[in-house]
C-alpha cells in the first residue's frame, strides 16, 4: 500500500489542503504503508521555489514525515514518452480552436439547450486540414478522447460513485506549447510510483472518472486504484474557506502560536463521527479510521481549534515547551503560566510580566492599601508560605477580603486583572521587583 500528497507550489499550504495531507499520512501510517510527497510543479507560470520550500517546512512542522520526495518537473522525459504513446493509439488528438472559438461554441450549445461540452469537431480533422493549420502557424493543444459509458468505483468515503464520461468534455492533457497538464501527469506518476490509494477532496470526483479512463488507456485495470474523496471543508458559516486562505495558511497559524499537534489532531477528526481531542502523533495514527468521515461537508471552527490548542499547552511538559520559552525560563515559570496561555505566542507576554517592565493602572482608591501592603511585605528569604502569610496579615489588618484584597495586588504586581496564581508569580518576581512595582502602582 502506498499513498501520496501532491500539492502544487503555487501558494502556501492552508488548513484545507493540510487536511488532505494529514488524512493521507495518517491513513498510510495506520496501515503500515508508504507516504510519498510529490510536488506537482508543471505549472511553471504560477509555481515558485519559495512555495515548494514552504510546503516542506509546513509538513515537517506538522510532523508528517514522507518516505519519498518527487518533483514532476524532473519527469518530463517520461511524460513525453507516454504522450507519444497516447498520440499513436489515437487517444490524444490535436485541436486547433482558439479560446474565442471554444467560447463561441459553448455559448451556441447553451442557446440550443445542449450541455456546454466540447463537440469533438477536431476528431474529424483530415491530415490535409491539419497540415494547412500548422502551415498557417497554428500549434494544437491535445485532447484525450474519453471512452463511452461511465466509470464507477467504490469510494471509501462516498460509497459507490459513477461519472458519465459522455456528459463531460474530452479533457485537454497537453497545452499548445507542449507542456503536460496535471490530469495526465498525475496518472502517469501514480502508476509509475506504485500508488495504491488516492485520498483527496470531493471536488475531484469528476476528475477521478476521467483519470480512471486515462489509467485504463495506459494499461491499468479498472480497479487499479482505491479512492477516498473527503467532503469539502467550509468555514464556520458554511461559506467557502478559500476566502480566508491567507489567515488560515499553516505559515500564519504557526506564527500565531498554534501547536502542530493541535492542528493535526483537529484536522484528523473534523468532519468525522469522532470528537476532536488532543493526541500525540502515535495516538492519531492508531485512532485514524477513514470510514468515520462523514459524507457531508465539514466546517472549520477556529474556536474549537483554539480550545484544543489551549488544552495542549496547558498539559505540555516543560521539556516540550522549551522551544517556545526564553532561554532563561525554568520549569517553575512554565508551570506557573501554562494554564493562562491559549497560544505559544502569548508566552513572551507573561515573561515580560514577570521579568520585564509593566505599566500599572491607576488605583487612587487603593493607594493607602497598597502602601500598607508595601510596608508589611515580608523580608527575604521567601518560601512557599510567603504569599499566604503576607495576604493573611493584610486581610486581618485592613479588613479586606476576596476581590477587594487580591485585585489591587494583582493589578499592581502584573498590570493585569487576571492571570497565573500570584503566590507563584511572587516567588518568580522576587522582593526587589515586587517592591518596585508596588511603589510604581502607588504613584500611578
UniProtKB/Swiss-Prot annotation:
Sites where the protein binds ATP: 243
GO cellular component, one term: cytosol
Biological processes, Gene Ontology terms: glutamyl-tRNA aminoacylation
Species: Gluconobacter oxydans (strain 621H)
Superkingdom, natural source: Bacteria
Compartments (UniProt record): Cytoplasm
Motif placement: 'KMSKS' region: 240-244
Claim: DNA-binding is one of the keywords in the record: no
E.C. no: 6.1.1.17
Keywords linked to the UniProt accession: Aminoacyl-tRNA synthetase, ATP-binding, Cytoplasm, Ligase, Nucleotide-binding, Protein biosynthesis
Oligomeric form and interacting partners: Monomer.
Chain ranges for the short sequence motif 'HIGH' region as given in the UniProt record: 7-17
Name of the encoding gene: gltX2
Family: Belongs to the class-I aminoacyl-tRNA synthetase family. Glutamate--tRNA ligase type 1 subfamily.
Reactions it catalyzes: tRNA(Glu) + L-glutamate + ATP = L-glutamyl-tRNA(Glu) + AMP + diphosphate
Name used for this protein in its record: Glutamate--tRNA ligase 2
Amino acid at each position: 500500500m502506498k499513498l501520496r500528497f501532491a500539492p502544487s507550489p503555487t501558494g502556501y499550504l492552508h488548513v484545507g489542503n493540510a487536511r488532505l495531507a494529514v488524512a493521507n499520512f495518517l491513513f498510510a501510517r495506520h496501515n503500515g504503508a508508504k507516504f510519498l510527497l510529490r510536488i506537482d510543479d508543471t505549472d511553471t507560470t504560477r509555481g515558485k521555489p519559495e512555495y515548494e520550500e514552504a510546503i516542506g517546512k509546513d509538513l515537517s512542522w506538522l510532523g508528517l514525515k514522507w518516505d519519498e520526495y518527487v518533483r514532476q518537473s524532473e519527469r518530463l522525459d517520461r511524460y513525453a514518452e507516454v504522450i507519444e504513446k497516447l498520440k499513436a493509439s489515437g487517444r490524444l488528438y490535436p485541436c486547433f480552436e482558439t479560446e474565442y472559438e471554444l467560447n463561441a461554441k459553448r455559448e451556441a450549445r447553451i442557446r440550443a439547450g445542449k450541455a456546454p461540452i466540447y463537440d469533438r469537431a477536431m476528431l474529424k480533422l483530415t491530415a490535409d486540414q491539419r497540415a494547412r493549420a500548422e502551415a498557417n502557424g497554428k500549434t494544437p493543444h491535445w485532447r484525450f478522447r474519453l471512452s463511452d459509458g461511465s466509470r464507477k468505483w467504490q469510494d471509501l468515503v462516498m460509497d459507490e460513485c459513477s461519472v458519465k464520461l459522455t456528459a463531460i468534455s474530452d479533457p485537454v492533457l497537453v497545452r499548445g506549447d507542449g507542456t503536460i497538464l496535471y490530469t495526465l501527469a498525475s496518472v502517469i506518476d501514480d502508476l509509475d510510483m506504485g500508488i495504491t490509494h488516492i485520498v483527496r477532496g470531493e471536488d475531484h470526483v469528476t476528475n477521478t472518472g476521467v483519470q480512471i479512463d486515462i489509467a485504463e488507456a495506459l494499461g491499468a485495470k479498472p480497479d487499479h486504484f482505491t479512492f477516498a474523496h473527503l467532503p469539502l471543508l467550509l468555514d464556520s458559516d458554511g461559506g467557502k474557506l478559500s476566502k480566508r486562505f491567507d489567515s488560515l495558511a499553516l505559515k500564519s497559524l504557526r506564527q500565531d502560536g498554534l501547536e502542530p499537534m493541535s492542528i493535526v489532531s483537529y484536522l484528523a477528526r473534523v468532519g468525522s463521527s469522532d470528537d476532536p481531542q488532543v493526541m500525540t502523533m502515535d495516538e492519531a495514527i492508531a485512532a485514524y479510521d477513514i470510514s468515520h468521515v462523514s459524507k457531508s461537508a465539514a466546517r472549520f471552527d477556529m474556536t474549537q481549534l483554539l480550545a484544543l490548542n489551549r488544552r495542549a499547552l496547558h498539559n505540555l511538559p516543560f521539556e516540550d515547551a522549551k522551544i517556545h520559552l526564553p532561554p532563561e525560563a525554568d520549569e517553575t515559570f512554565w508551570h506557573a503560566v501554562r494554564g493562562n496561555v491559549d497560544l505559544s505566542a502569548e508566552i513572551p507576554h507573561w515573561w515580560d510580566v514577570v521579568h520585564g517592565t509593566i505599566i500599572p493602572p491607576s488605583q487612587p482608591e487603593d493607594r493607602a492599601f497598597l502602601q500598607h501592603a508595601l510596608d508589611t511585605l515580608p523580608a527575604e528569604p521567601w518560601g512557599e508560605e510567603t504569599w499566604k502569610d503576607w495576604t493573611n496579615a493584610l486581610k486581618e489588618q485592613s479588613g479586606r477580603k476576596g476581590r477587594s484584597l487580591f485585585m489591587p495586588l494583582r493589578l499592581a504586581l502584573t498590570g493585569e486583572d487576571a492571570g497565573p496564581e500570584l503566590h507563584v508569580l511572587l516567588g518568580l518576581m522576587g522582593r526587589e521587583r515586587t517592591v518596585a512595582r508596588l511603589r510604581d502602582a502607588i504613584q500611578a
